[in-house]
């Protein structure tokens, strides 16, 4: 890759042009989609738009020290990016794995610790991403948040892993 624009252009080459769900948060959320102070609302907006719009907004803020947060979560590849799977796919069906491929696109976003129902294969193609895995018996020590609302459809840990409050979360 010569630049961040290269993978954006590559994705747009497969774009079906359908409206997609995407999320936006102002610079004040510092890339961390989460709850408000009393856990009654989320600190970001879910909207509908085009992939070109989202990628354009990401590109507009590539060099901002505190950019707004933009992401597209679990976009089903075959419907939104026809041909992408054939050009980049994992041969899952050859191994009797029935899993529709999805893609996650965003800028500097920190996803809170959560449990994904599907079995995932994670691959960071552009940029950097850290995945921290915990055994199931540690769930209580991760302080799960409320069932509704949720930042991504599943319950997330309320602990800020980058700045944990050990008084509020002593078992973390």
Predicted regions mapped to residue ranges:
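N-terminal accessory scaffold of Fe(II)-dependent oxygenases
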Residues: 1-172
């Amino acid at each position: 890759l010569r630049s961040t624009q290269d993978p954006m252009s590559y994705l747009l080459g497969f774009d079906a042009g359908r409206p997609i769900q995407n999320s936006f948060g102002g610079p004040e959320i510092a890339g961390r989609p989460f709850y408000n102070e009393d856990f009654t609302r989320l600190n970001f907006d879910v909207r509908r738009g085009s992939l070109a719009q989202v990628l354009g907004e990401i590109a507009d803020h590539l060099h901002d020290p505190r950019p707004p947060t933009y992401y597209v979560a679990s976009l089903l590849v075959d419907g939104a990016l026809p041909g992408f799977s054939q050009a980049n796919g994992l041969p899952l069906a050859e191994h009797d794995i029935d899993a529709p491929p999805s893609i996650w696109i965003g800028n500097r976003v920190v996803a809170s610790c959560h449990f994904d129902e599907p079995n995932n294969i994670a691959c960071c193609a552009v940029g950097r991403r850290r995945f921290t895995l915990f055994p199931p018996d540690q769930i209580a020590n991760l302080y799960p948040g409320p069932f509704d609302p949720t930042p991504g459809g599943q319950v997330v840990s309320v602990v800020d892993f980058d700045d944990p409050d050990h008084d509020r979360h002593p078992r973390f």
